[in-house]
Design a protein with these regions (language model features):
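Gram-negative outer-membrane beta-barrel transporters
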Residues: 134, 237-239, 252-337, 374, ...
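Membrane-embedded beta-barrel scaffold of Gram-negative outer-membrane proteins
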Residues: 1-15, 19-25, 185-186, 211-268, ...
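C-terminal beta-signal and adjacent terminal beta-strands/loops
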Residues: 272, 317, 328-335, 355-404
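Surface-exposed loop/turn segments flanking beta-strands in extracellular/periplasmic regions
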Residues: 31-37, 84-114, 160-163, 206-209, ...
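Transmembrane beta-strands of outer-membrane beta-barrel pores
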Residues: 16-22, 59, 74-80, 143-149, ...
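Structural signature of Gram-negative outer-membrane beta-barrels, strongest in the C-terminal barrel
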Residues: 48, 67-71, 75-77, 115-240, ...
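Repeated loop/turn-to-beta-strand initiation elements of outer-membrane beta-barrel proteins
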Residues: 7-10, 65, 135-139, 181-185, ...
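Face-selective signature of the C-terminal outer-membrane beta-barrel domain
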Residues: 1-19, 41-154, 178
Length: 404
């Protein structure tokens, strides 16, 4: 950042990275209610190269009784995805309740990583927050021009097989009313162009980038902030595409509408006792699908309720010692769009302590945490490709930090 004046600042950033992954893996598919699975082992080599940059200017000024905080920004993001994949020949059968130790299937290492897709995102945005009557009313208006260019490539010939070049101007507007210093009431609406999903490895079109889409979000809520304690409440609606596998081909031709309520607390509820967390109630409905068996169903991997609440206590018997506990709860989640299979709800408890002291004139903090104290066995979640992940077992974490 560079301050041109007291009220005008230039800013910019740049970043780049390359990720390479080589792995032998499989995706066991559950065949029936008894938990029987079937799988074919694959060997994959992935590579993702990416870079991003942005620059802009921020400024503050007044027009009459109206204060302005304006921003102009340009941005660019580019990535390239490459993957080599070879499948094994043997089918491995097992059971999630009684695992079978199958002999290792010999799978060759892919000789190359052909490029499968590349994406470029460019954007130009402008926004202004107008403040009136000692910040009693704040109105933010803005617009962003976005362009997404995506090409998919044939893994053998390198030829472009499909592509997208979409651009759109998306709006953003928000209003905040502050009757007093502790209470804020707000509402906002925004749209954004996003890149499409990448087809999963289990699909016949694995690695293919889906078309860009415009997501729309509307939200309204209330925030109470008394300095040492506060609470929030919000309701929201988000519409976006939803992907699905049809005849083993992945497409994002469905639409998902998320409606929800979020309640949160933060701060000191009594001397030396703090709370942080909240609860979310979610109705994630498939509003547009290509099948009557999925129309109106709940989206994959979208729990109707999730809770995360952490409490901390600064102990009176040991100066610098803080004890903490976290409760996590997630309700059942559907595994498929027909809503015939789900994973059950789960609850875990984490316990920890933090001890601050001075060692050799250096502030030092010791931390110890045990996650999933009761060692619950559970399915943690489901991704958009109907892949179920196993919850982490009881885990102990230790760390030491020093402020020099």
């Amino acid at each position: 950042e560079y301050d041109l004046t007291e009220k005008m600042t230039l800013f910019g950033s740049f970043g780049a990275g390359k990720t390479q992954v080589e792995r032998l893996f499989g995706y066991p598919e559950i065949q029936n209610s008894a938990g029987d699975t079937s799988d074919t082992v694959s060997y994959a080599k992935f590579q993702t190269k990416r870079w991003t940059a942005d620059a802009g200017v921020r400024g503050e000024f007044e027009t009459g009784f109206v204060g302005h905080k304006a921003t102009f920004q340009v941005s660019r993001y580019s990535d390239e995805f490459s993957r080599g994949l070879l499948n094994g020949g043997a089918t491995l059968n097992s059971n999630i309740y009684s695992p079978v130790a199958n002999p290792m299937d010999a799978v060759s290492v892919p000789a190359s990583r052909p490029k499968l897709s590349e994406t470029d995102l460019t954007g130009v945005a402008i926004a202004d927050t107008l403040s009136m009557w000692d910040d009693f009313l704040q109105v933010t208006v803005g617009a962003r021009h976005q362009r997404i260019e995506t090409d998919n490539f044939n893994a053998t010939t390198g030829a472009i097989t499909s592509g997208y070049d979409d651009s759109v101007v998306t709006p953003m507007v928000g209003v905040v009313v502050k009757p007093n210093n502790s209470l804020s009431v707000y509402a906002n609406y925004l749209e954004g162009l996003s890149r499409g999903s990448i087809a999963p490895d289990t699909a016949t079109n694995a690695g293919e980038a889906m078309a860009p889409y415009v997501a729309k979000q509307i939200e309204t809520g209330v925030k109470l902030d008394y300095g040492n304690f506060g609470a929030t409440a919000a309701i929201f609606q988000i519409t976006k595409p939803s992907g699905q596998l049809v005849n083993n081909v992945y497409n994002s031709d469905a639409e998902q509408r998320n409606r929800g309520i979020e309640l949160g607390v933060f701060g000191e509820v009594m001397p030396n006792v703090r709370l942080l967390g909240g609860v979310m109630f979610l109705d994630a409905e498939l509003t547009k699908t290509n099948s009557a068996t999925t129309q109106g169903n709940q989206a994959v991997g979208a729990p109707e309720m999730s809770i995360n609440l952490t409490a901390e206590w600064d102990t009176p018997f040991a100066q610098g010692l803080t004890l903490s506990g976290t409760v996590n709860h997630v309700s059942e989640q559907y595994v498929n769009t027909t809503n015939t299979v789900d994973i059950p709800d789960w609850t875990t408890l984490d316990l920890g302590l933090r001890y601050k002291t001075i060692f050799a004139e250096t502030p030092v903090t010791f931390r110890a945490t045990i996650q999933n104290v009761t060692d619950e066995d559970y399915w943690a979640g489901v991704n958009e490709f109907s892949m179920v992940s196993v919850g982490a077992p009881r885990t102990a974490l230790l760390s030491v930090t020093a402020d020099f």
